[in-house]
Amino acid sequence: EIMPSLVGSEMCIRDSFYHIYPLGLTGAPKHNDYSAPVSRLNTLLPWIDHIREIGCTALYIGPLFESVGHGYETTDYKKLDSRLGTNEDLKNFVAACHEKEIKVIFDGVFNHTGRDFFAFKDIQQNREHSRYLNWYCNVNFGGNTEYNDGFSYENWGGYNLLVKLNQRNPEVQNYICDVIRFWVSEFDVDGIRLDAADVLDFDFMRALRRTAAEVKEDFWLMGEVIHGDYSRWVNGETLHSVTNYALHKALYSGHNDHNYFEIAHTVKYLQNMGNLDLYNFVDNHDVERIYTKLSNKAHFAPVHVLLYTLPGVPSIYYGSEFGIEGKKEKFSDDSLRPALDIKDYADAVQKNPCTALIAALGKIRQHTPALSYGSYAELQLTNRQFAFARDLDGIRVIVTVNNDDNAADMSLPAGNCAEYIGTLTGRKVPVQDGRINVTVAANSGEIWVPAGEMPEYIPVKTETADIEKVQEETEETTSTQTESPAQKTITATEETAAAKAEDIQPEKTADTSATSAESSFPENKEVAAEPAKTVIADLNKSPEDMNVDELQQAILAKMAGNGPVTDQMKKTVYDNIWHDSLVNWLKSFH
């Protein structure tokens, strides 16, 4: 068994998150002309009851502050984006969330600013004489950009619209820490999600962590990290949590490829980092909707059962609880960030099987501490069935999932009780000789708890007639999308199994990992590490002066000094091709 370890704040470990991209959800204009504020944020007030109804107890919302476009090119950290309203609107919104016992986490875009930020505008005006010259990285008056400023500078992601802050400058650190203090005093925010945390300076993050401890008890810092060893960020000195992109990839590809080995192996890989409390998700404002990503829409159920029961903190991206679709476009993320009206989904918890499932899982998680704090133990694993336990204080909760089009029988070691009850179906099974024998329906999941541990529950209903009705209603209310979501059953019927019988494959235990995915993460197979590179890193060079190949080799050399370097470790290094991220990684070695 693997026990979880708590790193710093326990504030959000028990929570289930809801994630809102406000400029998209409110239908705000794509470009900010800095005109009079329009209080679009107030249109999100009715969403608060919905967030609570589906069992979410924390809200990550952002970006929120004044910017010129998508929100990540901040021009004023202390003013709500005028397309969303006024600071008073934001203060009232947070207060309304708190009234419903929902914590609020802001998006903190501290790696870079927009070109309209006061410090950058001062450099444009005063050039070499600007007192803010060292607020940004590598300002060079011998260069130029497409904006014809007469100087060049370091940007983020190749976009000169996003000007990289010099986070090692004490003035910048103090300014951003003051921003955090302002957000707490003005808006009573409960935490911050740090954008692009994988390229933030580690000393800068330590300063943010010290400020977090100062401003509010259990103030929570969560970072956006794509690749790497998450324990470099999640520890007692830097962040409380980071985005779990490794599990995100495994959850959809593990179902699309009928490969639960990938998911189970990813969980072990993450546990070996130190049993961190990671921010788990199946979609967000940067990646395709899970309903679009799944080859078999019926897998919506087992995917979300795993999201809510595996170690970590679960998050639902707005709209995905309704089963809406969203396909990533080549030059725009607008399709991932649609405007929605909550009135169009007024009865979703009662009528939409996707929403009903999410609401049930949220309630189950709230009433089952083992899902937040319990140790993790794998019980049974094939490529199509997976069972594990979460154990806490002598109580064993058992989770079963099945990605096959047929039902499956499982015999599993139980806890010290006489009977278990399925929290999603209400089905009861006796404990016999220390085991429970359960049948897991096709393309479904179940959470088994000792009878009496759940004070009340409402089994999820997925009658075909209701689903067809929801499909018709959803097609009407989401007509602006390129393809309306087919609200299909989330627990398979006998008719579905019979219709697909010819597609059923014999049970396999070999790896069937995805051949294509958004990113590379550990899977249950021998990892073919990249061939050894001929580049030899000069360790006397500063990390900033090394190129990507040199940084990779320097990191591997540092790893070798701490012990054997496995093929998986090499692959993790070679998968990271971002210069800033590699610089921070190399600096993190002591």
At which residue positions do the language-model features occur?
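Active-site-proximal helices and loops of the catalytic beta/alpha 8
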Residues: V94, H98-K100, Q124, S185, ...
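Aromatic-lined carbohydrate-binding/catalytic grooves of carbohydrate-active enzymes
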Residues: T26-P29, H50-N92, L208
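C-terminal beta-strand-rich structural cap/linker in extracellular carbohydrate-active enzymes
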Residues: Q432-E463
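Aromatic- and acidic-residue-enriched segments that line the glycan-binding/catalytic groove
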Residues: P37, H70-S82, F110-D149, S231, ...
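The substrate-binding groove and active-site-proximal loops of carbohydrate-active enzymes
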Residues: L23-L41, E73-T86, G158-Q173, D190-V199, ...
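Ser/Thr/Gly/Pro-rich low-complexity, disordered linker/stalk segments of secreted
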Residues: K461-A537
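Single conserved hydrophobic/aromatic residue that forms the stacking wall/gate
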Residues: E1-G8, I13
